[in-house]
Structures are given as C-alpha cells and as structure tokens.
Regions:
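Conserved hydrolase catalytic core segment
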Residues: 168-177
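Short beta-to-alpha linker loops that shape the active-site pocket of alpha/beta-hydrolase fold enzymes
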Residues: 57-62, 184
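Alpha/beta-hydrolase active-site loop
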Residues: 77-148
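Short beta-strand element of the alpha/beta-hydrolase
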Residues: 22-31
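The feature captures the conserved acid-bearing segment of alpha/beta-hydrolase catalytic domains
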Residues: 10-19, 176-206
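Serine-hydrolase catalytic-loop signature spanning alpha/beta hydrolases and amidase-signature enzymes
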Residues: 33-35
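Short amphipathic alpha-helix adjacent to the substrate-entry channel of hydrolases
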Residues: 38-56
Length: 206
C-alpha cells in the first residue's frame, strides 16, 4: 500500500454482510504482538451489522508500558515511569508518526521511533486508497478525502494496546463511535494507588 511502510502490511478487509449496509467503516486495532487474522470473528460480527470492516496491521511490537517504564540512568526523563504524559506522547507517535502536528500538538516522543509512513493513520489511508483503486465497487472513497482520513465516518475500536490507540484517536477527532476492549488508557501511581493516565481526562472531540 505504501513503499515507505517497513513492516506489518497484512491487513484484513471484510465487506458488509447484513441486509442494511451502513455508511460507516469499522476499523479494528489489534493488541501488542497480535495478528490481524486473530480477530476475524469480531470483523464478522461488525460485517453482519452492516459495517465494512478492517483489521489494521501496525507497529504493535512496540509496547507502551515498556517504552514508558525505563529505569536506567541514561533514559530520557520523558520515558520514565514518573513522567505522566509518556503514554500520551508514545501513543500519538504510533498513531500519527513522528514530526507530525495534530490539533496543534507535535507527535514526536523520544521513547519510540515510528515514521509517518508506519503510523496507524497513514496505513489506514493508504489501505483505503489501494482498495478503492483496485475495487471501486467496494465504495470506500467516502472514508477518506484526498490525503486525509474521514474519521467522522469511522468506528474506531481496538483491544489492549489497540484500545488505547482508539482512545487517542477519539480524543483528537470526532469519530462515529469508539470502542475500547480491555483497555482504553493506562494507569499511573497517585498516593500509592493506580489512577488513569492524565490524557484520559483531557477534553475530547468524541
């Protein structure tokens, strides 16, 4: 779909199978280390509900907990467990890529290295463009506009790490719906107790 994508380009697409095709796209983000084909049943349920459905491959070999849990003295301060915005910054780079601006905020964490090409957003955009080029009858042209994903037409969902990325997208954009399965955000310690990371309480577009 894009020659600049370095790995994990094995996506899954399922057309709508129900009697009523919705004008929405269901996008599923797998968890850490999971393969797109492992969630075929979830795509099937979405398809029978009338959604065209995609299980999107991305750089899910990067784990947020590991990248934000560095305890070595040479670690960047923003990659250590006591830095509250590490998860937000790491997830934004995985979703949008480094050196990217979203909602006037830079997406460039020193804890990970995910290019714009390898980002979730670019992978989804290039997949939609490729599918529409190869099979125009699928009717996917309404889910992107030029070089931009039409997030307002997308139900974004994910499991574990993928659920957290879905949460970031729903924070930054108005999406059709958002579903977090077994995690929407991580936790930080406060007075010896785990509480949701700060970004979970920030104003949201969705």
């Amino acid at each position: 779909t894009d020659e600049a994508i370095t790995s994990g380009d094995l996506h899954r697409y399922v057309p709508a199978l129900g009697s009523r095709q919705r004008d929405l796209l269901f996008v599923w983000l797998p968890g850490t280390g999971a393969e797109t084909q492992e969630f075929q049943n979830i795509l099937g349920v979405a398809a029978y509900a009338g959604y065209r459905s995609i299980s999107l491959a991305y750089k899910n070999n990067v784990t947020v907990n590991r990248e934000c849990g560095c305890t070595e003295s040479e670690c960047e301060s923003s990659c250590k467990p006591d830095y509250p915005d590490c998860e937000l910054e790491v997830r934004r780079e995985i979703v949008y890529g480094d050196d990217t601006q979203v909602s006037s905020l830079a997406c460039d964490s020193p804890c990970v290295d995910v290019s714009r090409a390898d980002s979730i957003e670019n992978r989804l955009l290039r997949l939609l463009q490729k599918l529409n080029e190869d099979e125009p009858s699928l009717g996917l042209e309404g889910f992107y506009d030029g070089e931009s994903v039409r997030w307002d037409k997308i139900v974004i969902a994910g499991w574990s790490q993928g659920g957290g990325h879905a949460g970031i997208i729903a924070k930054d954009y108005e999406v059709a719906r958002a579903v977090y399965v077994s995690k929407g955000a991580g936790a930080v310690a406060q007075n010896g107790m785990p509480v949701p990371v700060p970004w979970a309480s920030l104003p949201r577009q969705t």
